[in-house]
Design a protein with these regions (language model features):
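C-terminal terminal-subdomain/extension
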Residues: 44-163
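Compact nucleic-acid interaction/catalytic patches
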Residues: 6, 17-55
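Sparse, context-dependent recognition of short Cys/His-centered cofactor- or disulfide-binding micro-motifs
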Residues: 9, 41, 79
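Short beta-strand-centered aromatic/proline hotspots
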Residues: 11-15
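Short N-terminal edge-element motif at the start of the domain
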Residues: 1-8
Length: 163
């Protein structure tokens, strides 16, 4: 969820592997067919949303959160479930489209795509930078946890309550 003043906006998407990175491809209420998206349909065949591959970006594994549909209101839960079911039914098409958009953008061939797409290589560089920033924090947190346990064990007699 992203906070927008008094409201939270749920950011929903698909995580898939592209160029050895986890990529997050957002799902949007945008319902117009474009060459850089896949329309998502409900059980009646009506378009309900789309996967926007031009806006996909690499995401560190630690930042990926799984949405619990059961925590949502019934109507919204039904929408999420329909999107999820449809996406699972076309997994191969989704993977193929993500890789196609990624390669086409990086080839520099499609000038319109260059104007309307995220710069995947730059985002990958920034993702690696961010991950290198996170790794020392994780190591410090893990070391701190070990230290705390060692200190607790050493000073156990000092803080135990006599009975």
């Amino acid at each position: 969820n992203i906070n927008y003043g008094t409201n939270n906006k749920f950011v929903c998407g698909i995580v898939l592997s592209v160029n050895d990175f986890n990529y997050f491809a957002p799902i949007s209420s945008f319902e117009k067919q474009q060459k850089t998206n896949i329309l998502i349909k409900n059980s009646k065949g009506e378009t309900i949303s789309s996967i926007r591959f031009s806006f996909m970006f690499p995401i560190p594994k630690i930042e990926i959160k799984i949405k619990d549909f059961l925590k949502e209101e019934y109507k919204y839960r039904r929408l999420l479930l329909e999107e999820w079911q449809y996406c699972n039914s076309i997994k191969d098409k989704i993977i193929s489209k993500a890789n196609y958009i990624y390669k086409r953008y990086n080839s520099g061939y499609d000038k319109m795509l260059l104007k309307n797409c995220c710069n995947f290589k730059l985002l990958e560089e920034k993702c690696l930078e961010y991950q290198s920033y996170l790794e020392p924090i994780e190591e410090v947190a893990a070391a701190r946890e070990i230290e705390d346990k060692d200190i607790e064990e050493e000073n156990k007699e000092d803080w135990e309550i006599e009975r």
